[in-house]
């Protein structure tokens, strides 16, 4: 929940993210190290609260900051203005509101992602050498490669880079320093179709519409209805394994 420190909260949260209006450089601000460490923990928690408020604001929920600070003070002092039952029901109400608002925002984002993806594909399709398949996949063949044609059971080894249409990179085997080995049947539809246009040693750019990628689901940080761009290099092919 939002009103207590979650498991993901870290006392080492990046203080540099806090928007400080000023930094006082007075000496002897703290009487001892425990005071200093307590202050640092407070800054880190405050940073987490600020980030949480900003995220909630984006989905249309704005809680009162002063009330939150009073709640923190009362929790520390033990002087609560609400019963435990009221607190419990309030947390459930807040959780329900957050889930509802998040659901609405995700639908809105998914619709916008789809529209922007179609626009990107329309522009990309006009580039020299780009071809479009009947399924809607766009591809640009950079190097055909040689050898056997790929089948669904083919085991392949590839290097690849995946980006969103805004240029955000979400995966890159080159940066990890090792290629990926898998079977063609286990990849997303856009890969399965697009990789059959190259052979061992080939290289291709795929622009994959949502229905050939992850569709309306958000997967590993990839937003729903995202059009995906992949640069793929086919390093090795093993058929009949």
Swiss-Prot record:
E.C. code: 5.2.1.8
Name assigned to this protein: FKBP-type peptidyl-prolyl cis-trans isomerase FkpA
Keywords on record: Isomerase, Rotamase
Enzyme class: isomerase
Keyword Isomerase in annotation: yes
Domain PPIase FKBP-type: 153-241
SUPFAM superfamilies from the UniProt entry: FKBP-like
Species in which this protein is naturally found: Buchnera aphidicola subsp. Acyrthosiphon pisum (strain APS) (Acyrthosiphon pisum symbiotic bacterium)
PANTHER family: 39 KDA FK506-BINDING NUCLEAR PROTEIN (PTHR43811:SF19), FKBP-TYPE PEPTIDYL-PROLYL CIS-TRANS ISOMERASE FKPA (PTHR43811)
